[in-house]
């Protein structure tokens, strides 16, 4: 589910009220993984009421809640009221796209002005691997409002020649006690 808004697709189970909890319990008897949300529009789901969300949390072994989206862009910095992390959270995973490296801030970032400010770079400047580390470890970056265990996923590491750069990123993050996982879905 989400604490903000996210794209709606046919796989979401829409719930509105407490009586829908029984529906979720029955579905979980058949499926190990479900997506739950409250319909906002034809294209979006929004956050559940907090009381309803707390009841859903009790149903699952593992609940993944999107707390801050990036409009399908590989990098962002959160605005003042983001991310929305509920106090029951025990792990926050910050996600960035490796494909942002060697691209201009203004072209590759959601809220580029905030990324520019965080990195102390102009909007026309290029993102490098050290910028990913800075965003991962900065209190106004992916680590904002985090009061629990924290890890980072850098996805879209799709070429073997990028592995050395990944080692550099991992070593820099390790100095800040941040575990990083690199992924590729190709």
Regions of interest found by a model, annotated:
Residues 27-32, 60, 148, 176-178:
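A short helix-to-beta-strand connector/capping loop
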Residues 43-58, 68-176:
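Conserved catalytic-core segment of NTP-binding enzymes
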Residues 1-2, 34-38, 63-67, 94, ...:
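General beta-strand structural signal in soluble alpha/beta enzymes
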Residues 2-5, 178-186:
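Beta-strand->loop->alpha-helix junctions that form or flank phosphate-binding loops
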Residues 1-5, 12-13, 59-63, 67-71:
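Conserved, well-structured core segments that form the ligand-binding/active-site neighborhood
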Residues 37-40, 155-158, 185:
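Structural motif
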Residues 1-43:
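N-terminal phosphate/diphosphate-binding loop that engages ATP/GTP or pyrophosphate donors
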């Amino acid at each position: 589910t989400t604490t903000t808004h996210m794209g709606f697709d046919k796989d979401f189970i829409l719930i509105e009220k407490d009586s829908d909890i029984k529906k979720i319990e029955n579905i979980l008897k058949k499926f190990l993984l479900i997506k739950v949300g409250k319909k906002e529009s034809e294209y979006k789901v929004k956050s559940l009421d907090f009381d309803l969300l707390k009841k859903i949390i009790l149903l699952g072994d593992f609940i993944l809640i999107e707390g801050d989206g990036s409009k399908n862009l590989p990098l962002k910095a959160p605005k003042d009221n983001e991310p929305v992390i509920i106090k029951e959270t025990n792990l926050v995973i910050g996600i960035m796209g490796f494909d942002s490296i060697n691209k201009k801030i203004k072209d590759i970032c959601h809220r580029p002005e905030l990324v520019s400010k965080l990195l102390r770079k102009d909007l026309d400047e290029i993102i490098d691997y050290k910028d990913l580390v800075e965003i991962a470890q900065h209190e106004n970056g992916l680590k904002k409002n985090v009061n629990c265990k924290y890890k980072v996923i850098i996805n879209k590491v799709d070429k073997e020649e990028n592995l050395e750069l990944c080692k550099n990123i991992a070593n820099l993050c390790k100095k800040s006690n941040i575990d990083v996982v690199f992924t590729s879905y190709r």
